[in-house]
Regions:
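Sequence-level preference for short, compositionally simple segments enriched
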Residues: 1-271
Length: 271
């Protein structure tokens, strides 16, 4: 086990001043488990984690004490004149197996989806991924559970870090997390199990947009979760809509607020 500590404004104790600096200093051998303790503070960083076998945990009393924050968004025009798009808007990109995030807040601060479009907080395309007691905050497309679907609807729609990667399904587990947004704020193709989580709608829209591949047994499973409203009117939101034809979403023993439309799900023009 190799342990590292990150603190705002690194001191003589050997702490790293940023997560990006800690990532660069991790042991090269991926078989060595690494734990990164992150001291309370706000870390304005856009992160990519490509090394397996890593645990990142906030050292504060609650997940709101340790915040990873960035504000990229889909409608932003890049230097080449092309919009940033959904999959380059992430705050934290994880593309490695056996990663655990614990007691952290990961947020995309871009804001209103009508103005800024898609803005991913956490882009998780990985196997045996765990988020424990985390807050994942955004508006549209807050949490992407990769992989991408096999084909995009329009050219350049998947532009981002895994657009050319093999579509390998991963298993993801979210426990005691708070996840918020408005439009399609939990989306993707992974097999993902949400247990004891609060799924908070900030406005009219859709909590999920699964793209479960054909033949995959499970998509999203919500167990003992609470679908809550934070500023969302009555019957103005749906549990989800299918991003692709074989989307699978299951709820077990969940509490559903009055903001959810009686139909539960929207068909997004699909049969």
């Amino acid at each position: 086990m190799y342990t590292m500590t990150v603190a705002p404004g690194a001191d003589a104790s050997g702490s790293f001043y940023s997560l990006k600096a800690a990532f660069a200093a991790m042991p090269e051998d991926p078989a060595v488990p690494v734990t990164i303790r992150v001291m309370p503070g706000i870390y304005h960083e856009k992160l990519s984690l490509m090394r397996p076998n890593v645990t990142i945990e906030g050292a504060g009393a609650s997940p709101s004490d340790t915040v990873i924050s960035f504000g990229d968004y889909g409608y932003e025009i890049m230097p080449d004149g092309i919009k940033r798009g959904t999959f380059r808007s992430y705050t934290f990109f994880v593309h490695a197996a056996d990663v655990t995030l614990r007691n952290l807040t990961i947020e995309n601060t871009a804001g209103d989806s009508k103005t800024h479009g898609q803005a991913i907080a956490l882009y998780a395309e990985c196997d045996r991924f765990v988020a424990e007691s985390c807050r994942i905050l955004g508006h549209q497309d807050t949490l992407f559970t990769g992989p991408l679907p096999p084909e995009e609807y329009e050219p350049g729609g998947f532009r981002g870090p895994t657009e050319s990667a093999p579509r390998i399904n991963g298993r993801q587990y979210y426990h005691n997390c708070y996840i918020c947004g408005d439009i399609d704020f939990i989306f993707g193709s992974a097999t993902a199990y949400f247990e004891g989580c609060t799924i908070a709608s900030l406005g009219p829209g859709y909590a999920t947009a699964a793209s479960t591949p054909e033949g995959q047994e499970y998509g999203y499973v919500f167990h003992n979760c609470r679908f809550a409203a934070e500023g969302c009117p009555q019957h103005a939101a749906y549990i989800g809509r299918p991003w692709r034809d074989y989307a699978r979403v299951v709820l077990m023993d969940c509490a559903i607020g009055a903001h959810i439309h009686p139909a539960g799900f929207h068909d997004w023009g699909k049969e």
